[in-house]
C-alpha cells in the first residue's frame, strides 16, 4: 500500500489498509479454536502480541487488561472461566492444542475413558482450525508474543530448569515468579533483570505455544507468577516492556 505521495507504508497491504486503517471497527473482536474463544483487545499498531490462555488465571487477566489500557499491541484473552475447554465433549488444556501430538496426549490424560473415535474427532477439529489461531498469535517480524500465566504451590521454575537450555535464577527464594523465553537473544536481555529466567529452545513436545514458538522460530516470552501476585506480575511486565526491543 502507498500513500498519495508515492511513499510505501511498510507491512500494510491495501486490503489491511482499507479494512483496518479506515474502518478499524471491522477488525474481528473474537477468535477461537474448538471450545477456546478469545476476546481480542487492540491498542495502536505495536508488533507485540499478548495472550492469557487459561480461564482460571484471574490475576493474569486483570494484569493484561490493565496493561492494554496504556500499552500498544494486540491481546487475546480467553473467555472461559475454567482451566480446561471442551472439544467434542472432551476436556482439553488449551495450552496443549498447538500440536496434534500434544493435544492427543492431553486428551488422553484428561479423558481416560474416552473412546478412540471420540479422541480422533476432537483431533480433527483442532487440526482444521489450529493454523488460523496460530497465525493470529504469531507476532510480525521483529515482534514478540508475551503470555501471562499464574501458578500455584505445585509448580515453579524448579520444574523448568532441568529441561531448559540455560537458566538465570536471580530470585531463587521466589521460584513461582519467572520468565520463560524461546529466543537466546531475549534470554541475554532477560538475564540482566532481577528476576528468574529460563531459555527453552529444545524442550519436549507437549503442544504448548512455547514449544511451537521454539520450533517455528518466533519470539515468545512466558511470564509466570503465583496466583494473586498481581503487583509482581505488573512489575515484571513493565520491566519486560521497558528493556526488551
Q: Model features per residue range: what roles?
A:
Residues 3-24:
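N-terminal secretory signal peptides and thylakoid transit peptides that target proteins
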Residues 10-15, 28-29, 34-36:
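C-terminal segment of N-terminal export signals and the immediately downstream linker at the start
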Residues 28, 35-37, 58-63, 195, ...:
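Catalytic-site microenvironment of enzymes
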Residues 30-182:
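N-terminal catalytic or cofactor-binding beta/alpha core of small enzyme domains
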Residues 68-69, 191, 214:
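Anion (oxyanion) recognition and catalysis
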Residues 76, 146, 198, 221-223:
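Hydrophobic/aromatic beta-strand patches that form the interior of the parallel beta-sheet core
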Residues 174-201:
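Active-site-adjacent substrate-binding region
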Residues 200-245:
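Active-site-adjacent mobile loop/cap segments within catalytic or ligand-binding domains
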Amino acid at each position: 500500500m502507498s500513500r498519495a505521495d508515492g511513499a510505501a507504508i511498510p507491512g500494510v497491504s491495501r486490503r489491511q489498509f482499507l479494512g483496518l486503517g479506515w474502518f478499524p471497527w471491522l477488525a474481528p473482536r473474537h477468535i477461537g479454536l474448538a471450545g477456546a474463544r478469545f476476546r481480542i483487545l487492540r491498542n495502536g499498531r505495536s508488533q507485540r502480541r499478548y495472550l492469557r490462555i487459561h480461564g482460571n488465571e484471574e490475576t493474569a487477566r486483570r494484569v493484561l487488561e490493565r496493561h492494554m489500557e496504556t500499552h500498544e499491541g494486540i491481546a487475546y484473552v480467553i473467555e472461559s472461566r475454567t482451566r480446561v475447554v471442551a472439544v467434542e465433549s472432551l476436556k482439553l488444556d488449551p495450552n496443549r492444542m498447538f500440536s496434534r501430538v500434544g493435544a492427543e496426549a492431553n486428551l488422553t490424560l484428561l479423558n481416560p475413558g474416552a473412546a478412540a473415535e471420540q479422541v480422533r474427532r476432537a483431533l480433527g477439529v483442532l487440526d482444521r482450525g489450529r493454523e488460523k489461531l496460530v497465525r493470529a498469535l504469531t507476532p510480525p517480524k521483529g515482534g514478540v508474543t508475551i503470555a501471562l500465566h499464574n501458578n500455584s504451590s505445585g509448580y515453579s521454575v524448579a520444574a523448568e530448569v532441568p529441561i531448559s537450555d540455560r537458566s538465570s535464577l536471580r530470585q531463587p527464594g521466589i521460584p513461582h515468579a519467572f520468565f520463560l523465553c524461546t529466543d537466546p537473544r531475549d534470554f541475554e536481555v532477560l538475564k540482566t533483570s532481577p528476576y528468574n529466567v529460563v531459555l527453552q529452545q529444545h524442550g519436549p513436545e507437549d503442544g504448548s505455544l512455547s514449544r511451537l514458538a521454539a520450533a517455528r522460530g518466533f519470539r515468545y516470552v512466558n511470564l509466570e507468577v503465583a496466583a494473586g501476585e498481581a503487583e509482581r506480575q505488573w512489575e515484571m511486565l513493565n520491566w519486560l516492556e521497558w528493556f526488551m526491543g
